[in-house]
């Protein structure tokens, strides 16, 4: 699994290495040691793999735009991947004191490369469905609390 830094601080992309043959493929979608080492080396985040508390999944039809969403309070850390289909995924730095505030980064998440996007606390997140349908999976470090939801409409 490769780890790629992005132009935004604390935002990482994890790229698994699928093993393909005539039967299909096999890939590791999460590795605690790689995740923890990458976060420690490339970010200032105080999150470890053991901190994740909830996995969620959404299914979206072609052309659906979800977001931009975030979480108030102390925020949340999300690890996002597309298990089926493809999405154009976007994060926006909304941290009040960040020198990168207002800057965005986009990446295609799909069921070919299986990239994962690390979305830090204080960032807004959204995606546009590029395929007929897309299943997006979220690994989150705090259970959802609707009273902390923030977003741009």
Where are these regions (language model features)?
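Surface-exposed loop/turn positions
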Residues: 113-115, 123, 134
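Short beta-strand His + acidic residue motifs that chelate non-heme Fe in jelly-roll/DSBH
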Residues: 90, 117, 125-130
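Short, charged beta-turn/beta-strand-edge "cap" motif at the junction between a beta-strand
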Residues: 85, 123-124
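Non-catalytic, conserved peripheral segments adjacent to functional cores
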Residues: 1-112, 131-133, 140-153
């Amino acid at each position: 699994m490769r780890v790629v830094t992005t132009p935004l601080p604390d935002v990482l992309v994890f790229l698994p290495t699928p093993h393909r043959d005539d039967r299909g493929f096999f890939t590791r979608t999460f590795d605690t040691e790689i995740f923890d080492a990458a976060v420690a080396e490339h970010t200032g985040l105080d999150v470890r793999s053991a901190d994740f508390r909830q996995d969620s999944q959404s299914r979206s039809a072609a052309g659906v735009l979800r977001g931009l969403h975030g979480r108030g309070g102390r925020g949340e850390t999300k690890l996002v991947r597309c298990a089926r289909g493809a999405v154009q995924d976007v994060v926006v730095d909304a941290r009040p004191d960040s020198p990168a505030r207002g800057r965005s980064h986009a990446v295609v998440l799909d069921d070919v490369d299986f990239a994962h996007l690390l979305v830090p606390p204080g960032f807004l997140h959204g995606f546009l469905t590029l395929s007929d349908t897309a299943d997006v999976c979220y690994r989150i470090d705090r259970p959802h609390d609707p009273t902390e939801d923030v977003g741009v409409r």
